[in-house]
């Protein structure tokens, strides 16, 4: 009898992993191939957090946030990552924010050697990925200098094209970010930085965020809860282990970690506990409202939603 009991238990244990796997929810998760855009995804993959929290993640790389929002709208992506410059999209109802990722200081307005101020860029060619944090910083920096977009020649291009165009001197300046700026410096060591996110902090806070397809929030809230659990645990690991997080992200992206180290220093990682507190005291909604106000000023939005209507604060603070 004891032998039969043992065999029955053994068979039950044998089938447990299959049952757990069957319970996993498949999700398609987007990321951007830089430190702040990849680190949570990389940590979750390296540390087995997807499986731990019951998700079967299909991770997909994108060049920017707006393209991910398009993919969400098309139903080909469930969750994604966006930088500050794309926050106007959830503010217009095109996605829901499930969690804040970090506060960023990676963006710069850079120029060729010899330029000394934003005023020097009048009439010059400036490359910028439209709808990104680089785009937003460019607008802020021009405004601070008493200038408008019409005072310069804005050339819309994807991030990789900005790098090659700047290196070949096809453009005079760019609104772009680290680690791409590090790559540019290798080819144009005399380039100068004319503006940075930190020039506008704390009045203007540049958060990046994780977003979800509107339909998955409505139809599969359990998937959203599990995704947030993954993000929170990965955020805690990243904040406690910054150097190891760079190593993990470099391994995931198959790049030299030196390319990510500078970018990692140009941002602030927050623990899940800190983000819960900042959510409950209204700070996060304040950041999002501040961003929305800028988007209205820049003509990106006319009537932004209230952050409570697109940031899933109740999901994030639920314990």
Curated annotation (Swiss-Prot):
Entry's localization field: Periplasm
Pfam families for this protein: NMT1
Database matches in SMART domains: PBPb (SM00062)
Keywords: Periplasm, Signal, Transport
Origin: domain of life: Bacteria
SUPFAM superfamilies: Periplasmic binding protein-like II
Gene Ontology molecular function terms on file: ATPase-coupled transmembrane transporter activity
UniProt signal peptide: 1-22
InterPro entries found in the cross-reference section: ABC_SsuA_sub-bd, Solute-binding_3/MltF_N, SsuA/THI5
GO cellular component: membrane; periplasmic space
Primary localization: periplasm
Subunit structure: The complex is composed of two ATP-binding proteins (BAB2_1147), two transmembrane proteins (BAB2_1148) and a solute-binding protein (BAB2_1146).
Family under the similarity heading: Belongs to the bacterial solute-binding protein SsuA/TauA family.
Function recorded in the entry: Probably part of an ABC transporter complex.
PANTHER family: ALIPHATIC SULFONATES-BINDING PROTEIN-RELATED (PTHR30024), TAURINE-BINDING PERIPLASMIC PROTEIN (PTHR30024:SF47)
Protein's name according to its UniProt entry: Putative binding protein BAB2_1146
Upper classification of the organism: Bacteria, Pseudomonadati, Pseudomonadota, Alphaproteobacteria, Hyphomicrobiales
């Amino acid at each position: 009898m004891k032998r039969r009991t043992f065999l029955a238990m053994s068979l039950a244990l044998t089938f447990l992993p299959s049952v757990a796997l069957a319970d996993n929810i498949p999700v398609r998760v987007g990321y951007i191939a830089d430190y702040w855009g990849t680190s949570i995804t990389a940590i979750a993959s390296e540390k087995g957090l997807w499986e731990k929290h019951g998700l079967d993640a299909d991770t997909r790389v994108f060049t920017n946030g707006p393209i991910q929002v398009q993919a969400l709208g098309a139903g080909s992506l469930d969750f994604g990552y966006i930088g500050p410059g794309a926050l106007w999209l959830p503010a217009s109802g095109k996605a829901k924010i499930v969690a804040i990722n970090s506060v960023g200081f990676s963006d710069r307005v850079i120029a060729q050697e010899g330029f000394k101020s934003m005023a020097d860029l009048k009439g010059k060619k400036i490359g910028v990925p439209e709808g990104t944090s680089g785009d937003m910083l460019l607008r802020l920096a021009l405004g601070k200098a008493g200038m408008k977009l019409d005072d310069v020649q804005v050339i819309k291009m994807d991030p990789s094209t900005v790098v090659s165009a700047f290196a070949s001197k096809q453009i005079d300046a760019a609104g772009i970010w680290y680690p791409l700026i590090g790559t540019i410096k290798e080819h144009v060591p005399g380039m100068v930085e004319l503006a940075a996110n930190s020039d506008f902090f704390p009045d203007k806070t540049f958060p990046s965020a994780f977003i979800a397809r509107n339909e998955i929030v409505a139809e599969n809230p359990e998937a959203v809860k599990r995704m947030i659990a993954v993000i929170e645990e990965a955020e805690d690991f990243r904040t406690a282990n910054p150097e190891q997080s760079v190593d993990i992200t470099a391994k995931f992206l198959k790049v030299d970690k030196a390319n990510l180290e500078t970018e990692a220093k140009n941002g602030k990682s927050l623990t899940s506990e800190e983000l819960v507190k900042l959510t409950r005291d209204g700070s996060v909604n304040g950041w999002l409202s501040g961003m929305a106000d800028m988007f209205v000023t820049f003509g990106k939005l006319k009537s932004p939603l209230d952050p409570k209507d697109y940031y899933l604060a109740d999901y994030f603070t639920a314990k």
